[in-house]
Amino acid sequence: MTSRPGSGMARVGRQGMGGCPLRQDHHHVEGSPMNALVSAPISNNVVRFEPGIYFGVPEAEYHADQSLGSTSLKELIIDPVEYQHDQLYPGVEKETMALKWGHAIHCRALEGRLSLAERFAIAPAVTDYKDALVTMEHLRSHCKLVGVKPGKKKEEAIAAIREFDKDVLIWDEIIAKFEAENVGRTIIPRDALHEIEMAARWMQRDPKLAPVMRDGTFVAGASEVSIFYVENGVRLKARIDHLLSHAIIDLKSFRPFFKERALEAAKKAVSRMRYDLQAGAYIKALRAAAKLYAEGRVFNNPYDREFLDSVFRALAVAETDADSDDALKWVWVMIKASGAPQPVVGEFDLSSMIFKQAVADVDGAIVAYRGLMEKYGPDNEWEPDIPAQKWGDTDWSPYAFI
């Protein structure tokens, strides 16, 4: 990926081509799983975007549209039975520190320092409150000091202390006050913020990224571009992390399982997490977007027309001459999320065999999805069809049972 003049269009401060997004807000049938078929009945509180290229769509609205995104397509490729099981019996997704870290680096690199400060709050550290009462033992000791009974629970001890001592710092109250003041924000520890700022700084030092970044944030091109389209009667969507006139930037965080070089760990993460399939889904979406662009289906575009003109010119070149400097490239920016937050930047030609196979797999998943929906419907289990196997020595490596 090389920088070139005009790789990032200046914002023009006006409603772009197409005006406001065209969408229908309806209501979803309670308890019904996702159904991305165009023919699916619409009822109750469903957000459905019309086919088009959209700028500035809030993340929550994008995810509310039930079109199949890259994650769903990847799940359908790997195991459609498992996909439908997750739709019918969804578990409660916990927001782990790994997820928070990934969301935070996305926010910092794609939206900027101010957005990170607005959406994320830094948790107070107990080391900043050296005189605070933290444990039950601390509370009991202070109760003894002021001459009150602590009770059996923390809440009882705190209430007893507050009857006689209004000034002593109590850690539980500090945390409760902090959480009440930061409702709606994601809470991360101070160490995580330090790592994220370091990651953003190191990203910008990369010679391929430096020309399109400022203050640790992408400033050329457009972040979080949403594409909605229809294929084979199935509604599909994609949300590109960052789009340059000559490259698709996909930002990922990864955590190595073992101590190894960041470069090798990043490659393993791409393979293990099947990010190739996500890339295949995005490439399909961008090809569909070229047709939507030709039809004028672009909404809330704050950029000069030349920006998307250049994107789709580069895409057309990539289809015929992927090695050309003028061809659109795929760029993974992999950020190590444990230890030193090193960036690994990997550029891929869109014509690579890996991507061609990924696009073919996505094509197959769309066909399979429609067939399974027509056979079983959205509200029923999709029955497994694994034929009985005959296994032998060649089904395992010679070292499998050592």
Sequence positions of predicted segments:
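Acidic, Ala/Val/Gly-enriched low-complexity intrinsically disordered segments
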Residues: 8-12, 25, 29-30
